Swiss-Prot record:
Belongs to the PanB family. GO terms for molecular function: 3-methyl-2-oxobutanoate hydroxymethyltransferase activity; magnesium ion binding. Its cofactor is Mg(2+). This is 3-methyl-2-oxobutanoate hydroxymethyltransferase. 3-methyl-2-oxobutanoate binds at D52, S53, D91, K121. GO terms for biological process: pantothenate biosynthetic process. Mg(2+) binds at D52, D91, E123. It is found in: Cytoplasm. The active site is at E190 (proton acceptor). Binds 1 Mg(2+) ion per subunit. InterPro entries: Pantoate_hydroxy_MeTrfase, Pyrv/PenolPyrv_kinase-like_dom, Pyrv_kinase-like_dom_sf.
Length: 272
């Protein structure tokens, strides 16, 4: 007996705003390649983020800073080919939007035209408002990113929780309202106190998607390699692992190696 595949409605920017209005939580995961994106999309995840975290998990860099715009477009193109339902948001990498609003718009246009992505994400508030304004005025949907902003790691010096002090918390709240006013369709809040994140989410009408921001926001995002247990070195408090693929994959590779060495693979049934 065959099991019918569950059908999911195509997600749009408006869908996310409607989900917040209806009290439905938003699920978001990263993906960087066709195969992973196909699985994530088929599982009914609402948003796929082609994150600059590819710099870490795909290329082995210590930070997100080295990844280029061309590399982001390559990953995004692979993801877009795979999806039938999820909204695809693509990170603008470090150096592609900070220096000049015109450059920011050019970078965003390249991502949209060359990858087929549905929206872009960039880090920061008031300091990048002109870049955000330029991109949105061109008709490109923008997701904001506040709190811990990994592209500013050398400014912070550490990946610690942000906005614990009153002054920084007030700036974060002000930036969130500014992003909403400018037309951003959603905001990622990373590693901020849960009560503050809840307050921000309740103060604006656009969705707030958290990573290490508690349960009072409108949705959650995780890096797919982390939640699948493919990485063992990264153990933040907010991370829940839903599988141990590192262990399962290691065992599978070892079994394959042993079967090759012992001439058990291929068997007679696996030959032409």
């Amino acid at each position: 007996m065959s099991v019918a595949k569950k059908e999911y409605k195509r997600i749009t920017v408006k869908s996310l705003v409607d989900m917040k209005s209806n009290g439905e939580k938003i699920s978001m995961l990263t993906a960087y390649d066709f195969t992973m994106a196909q699985i994530v999309d088929g599982a009914g995840i609402d948003v796929i983020l082609v994150g600059d975290s590819a710099s870490n998990v795909m290329a082995g860099h210590e930070t997100t800073l080295p990844i280029t715009l061309d590399q982001m477009i390559y990953h995004a193109t692979s993801v877009v080919r795979a999806i039938t339902r999820s909204l695809v948001v693509v990170d603008l990498p470090f150096g592609s939007y900070q220096s000049d609003p015109k450059e920011a718009l050019r970078s965003a246009i390249r991502i949209m035209k060359e990858s087929g992505g549905h929206a872009v994400k960039l880090e920061g508030g008031k300091e990048v408002k002109e870049s955000i304004k330029r991109i949105i005025h061109a008709g490109i949907p923008v997701m904001g990113h506040l709190g811990l902003t990994p592209q500013s790691i050398y400014k912070f010096g550490t990946y610690t929780v942000r906005a614990k002090e009153e002054q920084e918390a007030e700036k974060l709240k002000s930036d969130a309202k500014l992003l909403e006013k400018m037309g951003c369709f959603a905001i990622v809040l990373e590693k901020v106190p849960a009560e503050l994140a809840k307050e921000v989410a309740e103060s604006i009408t656009i969705p707030v998607i958290g990573i290490g921001a508690g349960n009072g926001v409108d949705g959650q995002v995780l890096v797919v390699h982390d939640m699948l247990g493919m990485t063992h070195e990264f153990n933040p408090r907010f991370l829940r692992r839903y599988a141990d693929l590192h262990g399962e994959m290691t065992k599978a590779f070892q079994n394959y190696r042993d079967d090759v060495k012992s001439r058990k693979f291929p068997s007679d049934d696996e030959q032409y």
